[in-house]
Amino acid sequence: QGAFSSNANFYLASIAFAKKDMEEAKRLFSLVLESGDTKFREESWARKAEIEYLDKDYAAAMESFKHLQAVAENPENKEAAKLGLMRCAELTGQPQEALLAANDLLKEPKLSPEIMSEARYVRAKAYISLKQENKALADLKEISKDTRTIHGAEAKYLLAQLYYDNKDDTTAQTVLMNFIENGTPHQYWLARGFILLADIYIRQGDDFQARQYLTSLQNNYKGDDEIAAMIEDRLGKLKK
Protein backbone atom coordinates (compact mmCIF):
# COMPACT_ATOMS: atom_id res chain seq x y z
CA GLN A 1 0.00 0.00 0.00
CA GLY A 2 2.73 2.46 1.03
CA ALA A 3 4.90 1.83 -2.04
CA PHE A 4 1.87 1.95 -4.32
CA SER A 5 0.63 5.23 -2.86
CA SER A 6 4.06 6.90 -3.09
CA ASN A 7 4.30 5.71 -6.72
CA ALA A 8 0.87 7.20 -7.41
CA ASN A 9 1.63 10.42 -5.51
CA PHE A 10 4.91 10.92 -7.38
CA TYR A 11 3.18 10.31 -10.71
CA LEU A 12 0.34 12.74 -9.84
CA ALA A 13 2.83 15.29 -8.49
CA SER A 14 4.79 15.16 -11.75
CA ILE A 15 1.60 15.75 -13.75
CA ALA A 16 0.63 18.70 -11.51
CA PHE A 17 4.17 20.11 -11.87
CA ALA A 18 4.01 19.82 -15.67
CA LYS A 19 0.65 21.63 -15.62
CA LYS A 20 2.17 24.39 -13.43
CA ASP A 21 -0.23 23.54 -10.57
CA MET A 22 2.59 24.15 -8.11
CA GLU A 23 0.59 24.06 -4.86
CA GLU A 24 -0.79 20.60 -5.65
CA ALA A 25 2.59 19.40 -6.90
CA LYS A 26 4.29 20.55 -3.69
CA ARG A 27 1.62 18.85 -1.55
CA LEU A 28 2.05 15.55 -3.40
CA PHE A 29 5.88 15.66 -3.49
CA SER A 30 5.75 16.30 0.28
CA LEU A 31 3.57 13.19 0.72
CA VAL A 32 6.13 11.13 -1.22
CA LEU A 33 8.89 12.43 1.08
CA GLU A 34 6.83 11.76 4.22
CA SER A 35 6.25 8.15 3.10
CA GLY A 36 9.95 7.37 3.58
CA ASP A 37 10.08 5.61 0.20
CA THR A 38 13.60 6.29 -1.13
CA LYS A 39 12.83 5.50 -4.79
CA PHE A 40 11.56 8.99 -5.60
CA ARG A 41 13.25 10.85 -2.75
CA GLU A 42 15.91 12.68 -4.77
CA GLU A 43 13.55 13.89 -7.52
CA SER A 44 10.89 14.87 -4.96
CA TRP A 45 13.37 17.04 -3.02
CA ALA A 46 14.58 18.56 -6.31
CA ARG A 47 11.05 19.48 -7.43
CA LYS A 48 9.92 20.65 -3.96
CA ALA A 49 12.98 22.93 -3.67
CA GLU A 50 12.38 24.31 -7.17
CA ILE A 51 8.72 25.07 -6.40
CA GLU A 52 9.59 26.83 -3.13
CA TYR A 53 12.34 28.82 -4.85
CA LEU A 54 10.04 29.94 -7.68
CA ASP A 55 7.46 30.84 -5.02
CA LYS A 56 10.13 33.06 -3.36
CA ASP A 57 9.83 31.01 -0.15
CA TYR A 58 13.61 31.11 0.19
CA ALA A 59 13.84 29.87 3.80
CA ALA A 60 11.86 26.70 2.95
CA ALA A 61 13.73 26.29 -0.36
CA MET A 62 17.05 26.50 1.49
CA GLU A 63 16.05 23.59 3.74
CA SER A 64 14.88 21.55 0.74
CA PHE A 65 18.11 22.25 -1.16
CA LYS A 66 20.07 21.07 1.91
CA HIS A 67 18.07 17.80 1.91
CA LEU A 68 18.64 17.48 -1.84
CA GLN A 69 22.38 18.01 -1.41
CA ALA A 70 22.46 15.24 1.21
CA VAL A 71 20.74 12.62 -0.98
CA ALA A 72 21.62 13.67 -4.56
CA GLU A 73 23.39 11.14 -6.78
CA ASN A 74 22.48 12.70 -10.12
CA PRO A 75 25.22 15.27 -11.04
CA GLU A 76 22.60 17.78 -12.25
CA ASN A 77 20.78 17.61 -8.91
CA LYS A 78 24.06 17.95 -7.01
CA GLU A 79 24.84 21.15 -8.89
CA ALA A 80 21.23 22.39 -8.59
CA ALA A 81 21.35 21.90 -4.80
CA LYS A 82 24.57 23.91 -4.44
CA LEU A 83 23.34 26.63 -6.80
CA GLY A 84 19.99 26.81 -5.00
CA LEU A 85 21.66 27.07 -1.59
CA MET A 86 23.92 29.86 -2.84
CA ARG A 87 21.07 31.86 -4.37
CA CYS A 88 18.81 31.45 -1.33
CA ALA A 89 21.61 32.52 1.02
CA GLU A 90 22.29 35.62 -1.07
CA LEU A 91 18.61 36.51 -1.40
CA THR A 92 18.04 36.18 2.35
CA GLY A 93 21.08 38.31 3.24
CA GLN A 94 23.29 35.56 4.70
CA PRO A 95 26.78 36.40 3.37
CA GLN A 96 28.62 33.72 5.35
CA GLU A 97 26.26 31.00 4.05
CA ALA A 98 26.46 32.48 0.53
CA LEU A 99 30.26 32.43 0.67
CA LEU A 100 30.39 28.77 1.75
CA ALA A 101 27.83 27.77 -0.88
CA ALA A 102 29.66 29.68 -3.65
CA ASN A 103 32.97 28.01 -2.72
CA ASP A 104 31.22 24.63 -2.71
CA LEU A 105 29.62 25.29 -6.11
CA LEU A 106 32.93 26.43 -7.64
CA LYS A 107 34.39 22.99 -6.86
CA GLU A 108 31.96 21.43 -9.37
CA PRO A 109 33.94 20.21 -12.40
CA LYS A 110 31.60 21.10 -15.27
CA LEU A 111 30.09 24.50 -14.47
CA SER A 112 28.85 26.63 -17.36
CA PRO A 113 30.65 29.99 -17.75
CA GLU A 114 27.42 31.77 -16.68
CA ILE A 115 27.08 29.81 -13.42
CA MET A 116 30.81 30.18 -12.71
CA SER A 117 30.52 33.93 -13.17
CA GLU A 118 27.43 34.07 -10.92
CA ALA A 119 29.21 32.08 -8.18
CA ARG A 120 32.25 34.38 -8.34
CA TYR A 121 29.92 37.40 -8.19
CA VAL A 122 28.08 36.05 -5.12
CA ARG A 123 31.40 35.23 -3.45
CA ALA A 124 32.77 38.73 -4.13
CA LYS A 125 29.61 40.39 -2.78
CA ALA A 126 29.73 38.14 0.30
CA TYR A 127 33.35 39.15 0.98
CA ILE A 128 32.37 42.83 0.66
CA SER A 129 29.44 42.32 3.09
CA LEU A 130 31.81 40.59 5.52
CA LYS A 131 34.23 43.57 5.33
CA GLN A 132 36.89 41.40 3.64
CA GLU A 133 37.04 43.58 0.53
CA ASN A 134 40.57 42.60 -0.51
CA LYS A 135 39.46 38.98 -0.88
CA ALA A 136 36.82 40.15 -3.37
CA LEU A 137 39.36 41.72 -5.75
CA ALA A 138 40.35 38.56 -7.67
CA ASP A 139 36.73 37.62 -8.40
CA LEU A 140 35.75 41.19 -9.33
CA LYS A 141 38.71 41.47 -11.73
CA GLU A 142 37.73 38.19 -13.40
CA ILE A 143 33.98 38.89 -13.74
CA SER A 144 34.49 42.51 -14.82
CA LYS A 145 36.36 41.40 -17.96
CA ASP A 146 32.94 41.06 -19.62
CA THR A 147 30.83 44.16 -19.00
CA ARG A 148 28.10 42.93 -21.38
CA THR A 149 26.64 40.93 -18.48
CA ILE A 150 24.86 42.57 -15.53
CA HIS A 151 27.27 40.90 -13.09
CA GLY A 152 30.26 42.06 -15.14
CA ALA A 153 29.02 45.65 -15.26
CA GLU A 154 28.35 45.77 -11.51
CA ALA A 155 31.71 44.10 -10.81
CA LYS A 156 33.52 46.78 -12.85
CA TYR A 157 31.88 49.50 -10.78
CA LEU A 158 32.52 47.67 -7.48
CA LEU A 159 36.17 47.18 -8.40
CA ALA A 160 36.60 50.92 -8.97
CA GLN A 161 34.70 51.66 -5.74
CA LEU A 162 37.05 49.41 -3.74
CA TYR A 163 40.11 51.19 -5.15
CA TYR A 164 38.46 54.56 -4.41
CA ASP A 165 37.69 53.48 -0.82
CA ASN A 166 41.36 52.49 -0.44
CA LYS A 167 42.37 56.02 -1.61
CA ASP A 168 43.88 54.57 -4.81
CA ASP A 169 42.31 57.14 -7.13
CA THR A 170 44.68 56.43 -10.03
CA THR A 171 43.70 52.75 -10.31
CA ALA A 172 40.01 53.56 -9.73
CA GLN A 173 40.21 56.10 -12.56
CA THR A 174 41.90 53.59 -14.89
CA VAL A 175 39.17 51.00 -14.20
CA LEU A 176 36.41 53.55 -14.83
CA MET A 177 37.98 54.90 -18.05
CA ASN A 178 38.22 51.31 -19.29
CA PHE A 179 34.55 50.79 -18.35
CA ILE A 180 33.48 53.91 -20.28
CA GLU A 181 35.63 52.93 -23.27
CA ASN A 182 34.29 49.36 -23.46
CA GLY A 183 30.71 50.34 -22.65
CA THR A 184 27.90 48.13 -21.38
CA PRO A 185 24.20 47.62 -22.10
CA HIS A 186 23.62 48.05 -18.34
CA GLN A 187 23.33 51.83 -18.18
CA TYR A 188 22.67 52.03 -14.43
CA TRP A 189 26.13 50.68 -13.58
CA LEU A 190 27.80 52.89 -16.17
CA ALA A 191 26.03 55.89 -14.63
CA ARG A 192 27.28 54.85 -11.17
CA GLY A 193 30.75 54.71 -12.75
CA PHE A 194 30.41 58.29 -14.04
CA ILE A 195 29.31 59.48 -10.59
CA LEU A 196 32.27 57.72 -8.96
CA LEU A 197 34.58 59.38 -11.49
CA ALA A 198 33.09 62.75 -10.51
CA ASP A 199 33.72 61.85 -6.84
CA ILE A 200 37.38 61.21 -7.69
CA TYR A 201 37.68 64.62 -9.37
CA ILE A 202 35.95 66.30 -6.39
CA ARG A 203 38.40 64.64 -4.00
CA GLN A 204 41.28 65.84 -6.19
CA GLY A 205 39.89 69.40 -6.14
CA ASP A 206 39.04 69.39 -9.87
CA ASP A 207 35.48 70.68 -9.54
CA PHE A 208 35.36 71.72 -13.20
CA GLN A 209 35.90 68.16 -14.48
CA ALA A 210 33.48 66.76 -11.89
CA ARG A 211 30.78 69.21 -12.98
CA GLN A 212 31.37 68.33 -16.66
CA TYR A 213 30.81 64.62 -16.02
CA LEU A 214 27.79 65.17 -13.78
CA THR A 215 26.10 67.63 -16.16
CA SER A 216 26.72 65.36 -19.14
CA LEU A 217 25.23 62.41 -17.24
CA GLN A 218 22.26 64.51 -16.12
CA ASN A 219 21.51 65.43 -19.75
CA ASN A 220 21.90 61.92 -21.14
CA TYR A 221 20.75 59.43 -18.48
CA LYS A 222 17.16 58.28 -18.96
CA GLY A 223 16.76 55.79 -16.11
CA ASP A 224 14.05 56.23 -13.48
CA ASP A 225 16.04 55.49 -10.33
CA GLU A 226 18.22 57.17 -7.70
CA ILE A 227 20.87 58.34 -10.22
CA ALA A 228 19.15 61.73 -10.72
CA ALA A 229 19.18 62.37 -6.95
CA MET A 230 22.85 61.35 -6.69
CA ILE A 231 23.75 63.84 -9.46
CA GLU A 232 21.67 66.63 -7.84
CA ASP A 233 23.31 66.01 -4.47
CA ARG A 234 26.82 66.39 -5.91
CA LEU A 235 26.02 69.38 -8.14
CA GLY A 236 24.40 71.08 -5.13
CA LYS A 237 27.57 70.64 -3.08
CA LEU A 238 29.75 71.92 -5.96
CA LYS A 239 27.74 75.18 -6.07
CA LYS A 240 28.47 75.95 -2.40
Predicted regions mapped to residue ranges:
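Acidic, polar-rich low-complexity tracts and alpha-helical solenoid repeat scaffolds
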Residues: 1-240
